[in-house]
């Protein structure tokens, strides 16, 4: 029975490259000359620091541009609150990996509502979709690509 997995993953290597490029751009931009502003990655969290809140917002734009250039969807980021004190402003950005249970149920419901001849089951942080024909699976992918979910979805592990 043909099947595929629906996942939401971020390529950590590309994420590291995008952060490095954003740091290089900060070093060369005129409005950030002589300013202690930087991006740091610790696992699935990106910490950004700058002297002011305004500069943090500019850094967000730089990071979004670099991520888009590297093929990483900005929907996979969750921006935390900006913490300010007299010396600097900080913000934590969390990178979302995997599909949460609540969103997986929404995806499964969307497939059911489309009345396709496929079955879906939730396996941890991914969703397996099975159908009798490959055409049914292609229709399911089209439905999921057209749907609006809070995460970017990727399709992998195709089996015949």
UniProtKB/Swiss-Prot annotation:
InterPro entries associated with the record: DUF520, UPF0234-like_C, UPF0234_N, YajQ-like_sf
GO MF, one annotated term: nucleotide binding
One Pfam family per UniProt: DUF520
Keyword Nucleotide-binding tagged: yes
SUPFAM superfamilies xrefs: YajQ-like
Assigned GO CC terms: cytosol
Keywords, sorted A to Z: Nucleotide-binding
CDD domains to which the protein is assigned, alphabetical: YajQ_like
Role noted for this protein: Nucleotide-binding protein.
Listed PANTHER family: UPF0234 PROTEIN YAJQ
HAMAP family: YajQ
Similarity comment: family membership: Belongs to the YajQ family.
Protein name, per record: Nucleotide-binding protein Smal_3487
Organism this protein belongs to: Stenotrophomonas maltophilia (strain R551-3)
């Amino acid at each position: 029975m043909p099947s595929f997995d629906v996942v939401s993953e971020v390529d950590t290597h590309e994420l590291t490259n995008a952060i490095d490029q954003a740091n290089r751009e900060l070093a060369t931009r005129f409005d950030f000359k002589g300013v202690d502003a930087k991006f740091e990655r610790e696992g699935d969290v990106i910490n950004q620091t700058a002297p002011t809140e305004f500069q943090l917002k500019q850094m967000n734009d730089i990071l979004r541009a670099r991520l888009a250039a590297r093929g990483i969807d900005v929907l996979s980021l969750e921006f935390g609150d900006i913490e300010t004190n007299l010396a600097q402003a900080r913000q934590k950005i969390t990178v979302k990996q995997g599909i949460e249970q609540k969103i997986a149920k929404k995806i499964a419901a969307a497939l059911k509502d489309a009345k396709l001849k496929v079955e879906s089951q939730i396996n941890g942080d991914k969703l397996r979709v099975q159908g009798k024909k490959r055409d049914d699976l292609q229709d399911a992918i089209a439905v999921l690509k057209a749907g609006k979910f809070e995460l970017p979805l990727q399709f992998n592990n195709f089996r015949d």
